[in-house]
Amino acid sequence: VNEGEPTSVRRRSETRRRLLAAAAALFESTGTISQRVEDICGRAGFTRGAFYSNFTGVDQLYLALHEEQAARVWERLRHALDAQLAEESRADTLEDAVGFLLDSLPDSREWFSLRSVLLARAAADPAFAARMTLDDGHVGRELGDRFVALAAVHHRVPVVAAAVLAKAVVAAHVGAVSQSPVDVSGALTQRLTVAAVIRGLTVEAAAPTRT
């Protein structure tokens, strides 16, 4: 067993973490992913060699940052959905359930801003778009069944596939959040938009047939 391996793994992990943190800080201050490797390395306190031992380029770095931030959002959303599926903690109405879900999310404006920039890049770069598509497909599979179950709790049945419902909800929320800088009622807009999408893609469940 190579006793030095755990230390090198920890060192590599710390290098990656600091590079991601530097990229996040630069994006927050500039609003763009068009950063130079030298600027990211200078912010993180590393050489170009350390950068390229972790990432093939700036695009891969920002995709990794997006995935890391998204993972935190999805994890909180999964837990919030599970809470709404539990009888002892569920809300009385679909709108209240949506409010609970959105209130449970971390302050993720930076992620939504980064996602918007990455989507704009994806529109002009098919290869870049393919990498983001894989990420979104995973989200749909993870969350789809939970959104179907949430609809069922409120006596509604989806008219689309579970993954499509989940993607539509995420798209609606991302779109509403993107308006936050110019929307003084941003939280209400997000709640109404997400609830409207769920209602629009579901119908009332049929009443049980009496025998």
Mark where each language-model region is:
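Helix-turn-helix
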Residues: 18, 25-64
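Hydrophobic alpha-helical connector segments
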Residues: 60, 64, 77-112, 162-169
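Amphipathic alpha-helical packing segments from all-alpha helical-bundle domains
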Residues: 74, 106-116, 126-152
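Generic hydrophobic, amphipathic alpha-helix propensity
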Residues: 11-23, 40, 65-69, 73, ...
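An amphipathic alpha-helix signature
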Residues: 20, 95, 137-148, 166, ...
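N-terminal intrinsically disordered/low-complexity leader segments
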Residues: 1-14, 206-211
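Hydrophobic/aromatic-rich alpha-helical bundle segments in the mid-to-C-terminal region
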Residues: 129-133, 150-211
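Short loop-to-helix capping motifs
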Residues: 57, 121-126
